[in-house]
Amino acid sequence: MSFTNVSHSIPYALVGLVVVAIASIKWLRVAQREHYVPGYVVRFASRWYFSRESTANTSIAVVLAFAFIAAISRPHSPEVAIPALALGVVAAVFSPVGLGYKGRSSKLAWTRRAKVLYASTLAITAVLSVLAYLANLSAGLATVFVIFSPLLMDLASYVTRPFERRALDPFVKSAAAKLDQVNPVRVGITGSYGKTSTKNYIAQLASESLTELASPASFNNRGGLARAVNENLLPGTQVFIAEMGTYQKGEIASLVEWVKPNIVAITAIGPVHLERFGSEDAILEAKREIATDASTVVLNVDDKRLAGLADELEREGRHVVRASGTDTAREVSVVKDDAGNAAVYHHQRYLGSTSTPVALSNLAVAVAITLELGVPEEVIGKGLGGLKAASSRLNVVTTEAGVTVIDDTYNSNPAGARLALAQLEAHASQGGRRVVVTPGMVELGSQQYDENRALGVAIGVAATHICIVGLTNRRALLAGAKEGGGRLITLLEFRTRERAVEWVRQNLGSGDAVLYENDLPDHFA
């Protein structure tokens, strides 16, 4: 290779392509975890490189900035272009520090979509490399490509997104036809949080009277729901319960178009996914799409915005059922009784209670839907006694060592975190240690720092130890925990959840309790 011919050199162009091929593997993992939403790879790259908590990555970002400036200012100079390319190659392959290729908790799955996105990223890079070669800018633009490999992947996401949507069309059409053929009552559930728990409660309470199918796990998007129907909906199924999630306006409307739910519910409106929507009013507008054509709408009217929506829909002639976790005057309500159990009422008539830790409003919505499905009150009352929490949502177990473990690792939100801390206080023995292991909460937009600081304050009051995992919300949690005072005596920091769990195993004993509040995949810092 001639070092003097850096402007018009196939080897230099190939270097850029090969390095992008390597670096893109870790960014593909990020894209997959973020549901292939265009723009999110660059967003996460920015977080990794410009986090206040990582001076190493910020320093690398500064070096890359100099390499970029050098590459575009003097692309024909081998004395400048070659060192700039070398810096870009090393940084692209080995940084950001902490973001691995394999991943500990969020490994890359080489699905068809992942392969298409990866190949598209390389194809775009190859085309740009050819153009760079023809423009006599091989080494200079190769440096730019390796530095901006996250941007190239996001560009590929934009390009392939329409094709991916069309690729799903046959599966969606098949699912819609199968729903029409089997013709179950269709229930749609959405909300900022509480969707999966509410779906789980409905399935349990209705199963004694009806043959039901609930969409598995968090299969709550177009592809997931189509797969759930195509693979699991059997002839004779009387009820299909579909959890419906959204990352942008119009997504739920596209689900409603083919699922055609008869009964729908909105569990809550809150700051979860606020960074994607921009405001809670925008979240409400996206969530209310679920009620477009439904004959029955169940709403958690403890939320003032949903109470207003209930009045609006009722004026339109809809059948609206108001559910509450505080007000027994509502059609369905769930409140704490003197024993601390969740007591369920229908038109102020007692149905039964459960000792299972639940978000009261979620259970109220679930009972309201189950009643609308025609399940008798006495069957619901009996089912409440054996109600189980959804996986990783306030599951409580006691280990052989006598440690109470509260697992609330799935999809933490401000309301759920408060409930989880109450459970920690309720289950800890007198004098026992109360430990919270948490990375904090994410996707809260402009409220993220304040909400995590508030969580830190609450932990400071309820716990004796806080184990902060990772860097994402470290500053906010630390500030809140120190401000909270209360029982808190120890602040611990761990780079990974595995290390925090190991500390818990080595240090806690009989009478102690630990709450695992949220668990972020490792593409978060």
Language-model-detected regions and their locations in the chain:
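Transmembrane-cytosolic junction motif
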Residues: 30, 153-182
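Walker A (P-loop) phosphate-binding motif
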Residues: 174-218
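Flexible active-site lid/hinge loop adjacent to a nucleotide/diphosphate
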Residues: 221, 226-314, 442-453
